[in-house]
Curated annotation (Swiss-Prot):
It comes from the Bacteria. Keywords: Cell cycle, Cell division, Cell inner membrane, Cell membrane, Cell shape, Cell wall biogenesis/degradation, Magnesium, Membrane, Metal-binding, Peptidoglycan synthesis, Transferase, Transmembrane, Transmembrane helix. Its cofactor is Mg(2+). Its main location: membrane. One of its GO terms (biological process) is cell wall organization. It catalyses: UDP-N-acetyl-alpha-D-muramoyl-L-alanyl-gamma-D-glutamyl-meso-2,6-diaminopimeloyl-D-alanyl-D-alanine + di-trans,octa-cis-undecaprenyl phosphate = di-trans,octa-cis-undecaprenyl diphospho-N-acetyl-alpha-D-muramoyl-L-alanyl-D-glutamyl-meso-2,6-diaminopimeloyl-D-alanyl-D-alanine + UMP. Pathway: Cell wall biogenesis; peptidoglycan biosynthesis. This is Phospho-N-acetylmuramoyl-pentapeptide-transferase.
Amino acid sequence: MLVWLAEWLTPHLSFFHVVSYLTFRAIMSILTGLGFALWIGPRLIRRLQLLQIGQVVRNDGPESHFSKAGTPTMGGIMILLSIFLSVILWARLSNPYVWVVLFVLVSFGTIGFIDDYRKVIRKNPDGLIARWKYFWQSAAALVVAFFLYATATTDAQTVLVVPFFKDIMPQLGLLFILMTYFVIVGASNAVNLTDGLDGLAIMPTVMVAAGFALIAWATGNVNFANYLHIPYVANASELMVICTAIIGAGLGFLWFNTYPAQVFMGDVGSLALGAILGIIAVLVRQEFLLFIMGGVFVMETMSVILQVGSYKLRGQRIFRMAPIHHHYELKGWPEPRVIVRFWIITLVLVLLGLVTLKLR
């Protein structure tokens, strides 16, 4: 929105030309995202406490989690509002990719909100029935997938980029729709599974978003895209503003979510944030890099799949508890140690993912 205003004012006041620079808007997106979250946070927390919207703790979980019962949840609302407002302020709203990401934010945020509402307010421990949750996730993801496939104007928008191999970029064709669906829904649920400790999900989300901010900038810059042998996608650079909004809003949320947490993000936050990372990876054609940089999310998801599969097939559990962060808690690791070590792993994986852009 401010881009339009600045373009109108620039002929009269040249100072406003700075708003047209992507890097300036990306930095401002971080700052406003952070500012919105810090402003919304205390007000939202007080409101959640007033309405007695508190976390329900599993009886079979680690004993250290019993003290978390009643902590305000659905704090993801502050993250999504902060991202949305920052994007509306600083992104070029004429860019279709901006609206695709905002659609994902709103649709998956709504699914998560309904799930939290049923759990916390309606006192239904199962929340939104699993099949209906996956149905609406699938519906939203498929709408996006079909839209992107139908509106693709260049081959670069539907190729599969394979890390380490600069000459292997097969055209996906209709498989693009299927892959987009799995990436969005998979990422959404992976972040949701990771959100089990104070700050555990949000900081890896911030780090991965930072990595994709750089990738989006390079993908939308024809010179850097050619230099790195990655597809040039004309509209992709604007995604940098969205990624930096995630960084700012995420850090603002972490201010209240750090151990011991004053608020939890709930499904309204985790489902939406995962889906946003998924759609950004699709738009910049770096789905495999999401798999690498979001390795902690993958590890958490695989631990659940392996645990359930092993129990059904052999009647035995592999881990003391899944997702795997609970396994380490039950081994005696203090919660902050689990959190920080998972953060360190994510930092290493994000750097590794960025390095793969050059090692081709």
